[in-house]
């Protein structure tokens, strides 16, 4: 018996919608990364993008445990000399709630072209509305 190897043109991708309300950030991000990679499928192949499309709604209502709301810091650089910036989790949720989930999931995906292709299948929205109704996403309870 030969080992099955998925081909990019034969992979079937589904669309799922996940409500992040009250979900713990890390636990949500690990499951999203797993499904974006396709590891939940029997035909998973490490060098082929076999994952599904994931839509996350209510990203502004994601939760963290302990004192991470005030202690967890996000850093970025503006590109100018001395341009290092930082914001707490609470400030990031107020400024750009989508970025919190995107950063958490991106760190759990492979680095390189395949990981970037997987990350493009993640769609995150701060509110309860999304623009992917035509894809008929199934509700995924995590």
Swiss-Prot record:
Which species does the entry assign this protein to?
Haemophilus influenzae (strain ATCC 51907 / DSM 11121 / KW20 / Rd)
What's the name of the protein? Answer: Large ribosomal subunit protein uL13
Recorded name of the encoding gene:
rplM
Subunit architecture:
Part of the 50S ribosomal subunit.
Q: What GO biological process term is on the record, naming one?
A: translation
Q: Where does it sit, as one GO cellular component term?
A: cytosolic large ribosomal subunit
InterPro entries, alphabetically? Ribosomal_uL13 (IPR005822), Ribosomal_uL13_bac-type (IPR005823), Ribosomal_uL13_CS (IPR023563), Ribosomal_uL13_sf (IPR036899)
Q: What does this protein do?
A: This protein is one of the early assembly proteins of the 50S ribosomal subunit, although it is not seen to bind rRNA by itself. It is important during the early stages of 50S assembly.
Report keywords, A-Z. Answer: Ribonucleoprotein, Ribosomal protein
């Amino acid at each position: 018996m030969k080992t099955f190897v998925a081909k990019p043109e034969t992979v079937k991708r589904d669309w799922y919608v996940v409500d992040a309300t009250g979900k713990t950030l890390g636990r949500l991000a690990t499951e999203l990364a797993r499904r974006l990679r396709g590891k939940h499928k029997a035909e998973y192949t490490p060098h082929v993008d076999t994952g599904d499309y994931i839509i996350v709604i209510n990203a502004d209502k994601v939760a963290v445990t302990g004192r991470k709301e005030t202690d967890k810091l996000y850093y970025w650089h503006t590109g100018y000399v001395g341009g290092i910036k930082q914001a707490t989790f609470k400030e990031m949720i107020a400024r750009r709630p989508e970025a919190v989930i995107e950063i958490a999931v991106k760190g759990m995906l492979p680095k390189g072209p395949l990981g970037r292709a997987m990350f493009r299948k993640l769609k995150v929205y701060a509110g309860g509305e999304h623009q992917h109704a035509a894809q008929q996403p199934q509700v995924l309870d995590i």
